[in-house]
Amino acid sequence: MRLAYWMYEGTAHHGVGRIANSMRNVHAVFHAPQGDDYVNAIFAMLERSPNFPAMTTSVVSGTDLARGTIRLPDTLKQVEERVHPDLIIVVASCSTILLQENLEIAAQHAGLQCEVMVYDANPYRMQEIVAAESLFTDLVKRFAKPQPRTERPTVNILGPASLGFHARHDLISLRRMLKTLGVEINVVAPWGASIADLRRLPAAWLTIAPYRELGLRAATYLEEQFGVPALLDAPIGVQPTLRWIERLRELLAQAGADIPMPPLTAFSLDGLSAPSAVPWLARTADMDSFSGKPAFVFGDATHVVGVTRFLHDELGMPIAGAGTYVKHQADWVREQLAGYVDEVLVTDEFQTVAARIAALRPELVCGTQMERHTSRRYDLNCMVISPPTHIENHLLAYRPFLGFDGADVIADEVYTTCTLGMEKHLIDLFGDAGLELPEKAKNGSAQAVEPAPAAVTVESPKPEQEPAVATVAVSGPTPAVAAPPAPAAPVDPVWAADAEAMLKKVPFFVRGRVRGNVERYARQHGHAVITAQVLLAAKEELGA
């Protein structure tokens, strides 16, 4: 566990809250100080649900530190009286875990009628993803019982959960495809599942677990313990979805169910057209212009692999780089992306990812909320394809990432992300139609003010010498620049107003790359201030 102000994963008890908030008649009680109840606020803010989060904080105050569990039995009794859950999950937060208290004894003293499970979510060993996956697997192991197989072919869907990335939409997409195939659903978990539903998991003919982050271990356990085969692929993209459907039919056939393949039009929203417009879109002149735009992809394991392959295989975009913050899935990501990238970036430090993006300057960044901030800093196009996310990625409309519908959604995101901003480009080219009049009025005129020629003095200190002064003339027809002496250490160049004005005339979609090239030129030649003449010199030398 380490302290950071931006993290890709939440704390361990945040992962516990995701499972409890996903299930019916299950409640989480956090043994935590007042400050650790922020988890409740996160779920209330982001989850598009009219229900209160299924979690309660048993507050440990400063005066309780020596006997912090004294309030826990009363809190558990209050939760049982108010909520009437089938199961209460008790967990210490990342702060109270330091007290090393025996929560089992405190829970027993409460004398509850419902079942109580004390879960050891040690933040020094796990974060959100591992905590959620481990808890869900433990629940499946605890409650799943041998069952007779359902009469008709049915499947379990494991993985959709509270605060999952487009999880509700992905579930709708999976339901649509299964209904088209004539396959019924036995249990969806943890989303909307009860303890009784977990008991029925072994009755299914097949388990579908599309996410590497949640549901994978539970699906593997059901296969090993009860012989329920598992389909662990994520149908992201048109071709992967076709392969996913074929694999599903094969596994059900091995279990004794012959599932006929309906016409592809049956998978479309109207039942008449192609299930996805991506193959057609990829052949149009619009998408032809994207074939040379490099993309950088970063996020969780499932979406990084799926989106990277989709961009490369189906939209024809070169992949400048890819990576994941889910370290325990790094080997799987490397295996899946062999041939797509030379090296997979594996890190949970956003500064490292930001530095890679700054070095690559790709035309499109596919990442998390953090990469959205980084891209904004460098004026790069960005679309969010993975958690962590902000509220704008918890949408009301149907926006899946899985299946044929998901392929159309991702293609739309790529297209609109890369082309939106034309208005900005037109304003740069033809003026702002008076939008900057108030700013110009500060100079005493509403008309455009031409910058007067000026001389800029650049000081480049040398060791054990008086600073050398180089004077650069801005006016003049030729971009002659007096080369200053090389500095002892690399300078961090500052943009002069005339250079910034000239940079704004560069089309926005390559402006970030031009800025980076010019700054690199300035460092190499020791220019502390980037003037218009320095910019022109860099353009001549580098083709910036």
From Swiss-Prot:
GO terms for biological process: light-independent bacteriochlorophyll biosynthetic process; photosynthesis, dark reaction. Keywords: 4Fe-4S, ATP-binding, Bacteriochlorophyll biosynthesis, Chlorophyll biosynthesis, Iron, Iron-sulfur, Metal-binding, Nucleotide-binding, Oxidoreductase, Photosynthesis. Its EC number is 1.3.7.7. Binds 1 [4Fe-4S] cluster per heterodimer. The cluster is bound at the heterodimer interface by residues from both subunits. It holds the Pfam family PCP_red. Substrate binds at residues 421-422. GO terms for molecular function: 4 iron, 4 sulfur cluster binding; ATP binding; metal ion binding; oxidoreductase activity, acting on iron-sulfur proteins as donors; oxidoreductase activity, acting on the CH-CH group of donors, iron-sulfur protein as acceptor. Gene3D superfamilies: 1.20.89.20, Nitrogenase molybdenum iron protein domain, Proto-chlorophyllide reductase 57 kD subunit B. The active site is at 286 (proton donor). It catalyses: chlorophyllide a + oxidized 2[4Fe-4S]-[ferredoxin] + 2 ADP + 2 phosphate = protochlorophyllide a + reduced 2[4Fe-4S]-[ferredoxin] + 2 ATP + 2 H2O. It is an enzyme of class 1 (oxidoreductase). Pathway: Porphyrin-containing compound metabolism; bacteriochlorophyll biosynthesis (light-independent). Its cofactor is [4Fe-4S] cluster. [4Fe-4S] cluster binds at residue 36. HAMAP family: ChlB_BchB. Protochlorophyllide reductase is composed of three subunits; BchL, BchN and BchB. Forms a heterotetramer of two BchB and two BchN subunits. Component of the dark-operative protochlorophyllide reductase (DPOR) that uses Mg-ATP and reduced ferredoxin to reduce ring D of protochlorophyllide (Pchlide) to form chlorophyllide a (Chlide). This reaction is light-independent. The NB-protein (BchN-BchB) is the catalytic component of the complex. Belongs to the ChlB/BchB/BchZ family. This is Light-independent protochlorophyllide reductase subunit B. It comes from Chloroflexus aggregans (strain MD-66 / DSM 9485).
